[in-house]
Regions:
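Long, structured stretches of catalytic cores involved in phosphate-ester chemistry, encompassing
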Residues: 1-154
Length: 154
């Protein structure tokens, strides 16, 4: 309904989403190329995006490209007023991506109702391997405190 009537003048916001039907064909081509390349190279890719309403992290997999390691990380600008907790209903629970046959998203984290930000860190380990970590952060109960959820992307 929003796409046709532009209720609340948010049509453009919905149309630029990763999951909007108008983006499926381009997204499918992009993901197919990413998965194909990463599967043969064994490297990790993180799509970074921003949203003024929420924070989330997903692991993306493809049924044909088992060695590819792909993640999607979304967080907010620190100063934005957060959306209500009820907006969690708009965050995907995961599953197969519509319009991208064989591509699945596994939700690792989701947060609404709080200001938030994320930190992405890449560190070289002793054996020459790299560790990629994401810290998703939001305000704690006490003034000046921060809660942090760390994800190690493997």
């Amino acid at each position: 309904l929003v796409n046709y009537a532009d209720l609340g003048s948010v049509k453009d916001d919905f149309m630029d989403e990763w999951d909007h039907k108008s983006n499926w064909s381009e997204r499918a081509v992009l993901l197919r190329n990413v998965f194909d390349r990463l599967d043969s190279q064994g490297k990790l890719l993180v799509f970074l995006s921003g949203d003024v309403h929420c924070a989330s992290a997903y692991r993306l997999t493809h049924e044909r490209y088992r060695k590819a390691r792909v993640y999607q990380l979304t967080s907010s600008a620190i100063s934005r007023k957060p959306a209500p907790s009820a907006s969690m209903l708009g965050i995907s629970a995961g599953g197969e991506l519509k319009g991208s046959k064989g591509v699945f998203g596994e939700r690792l984290f989701a947060l609404t109702g709080n200001k938030n930000f994320s930190l992405l860190r890449v560190r070289r380990q002793a054996g020459g391997q790299y560790e990629v970590a994401v810290d998703l952060c939001w305000p704690g109960e006490e003034a000046g405190s921060t809660i942090r959820k760390r994800l190690i992307l493997d």
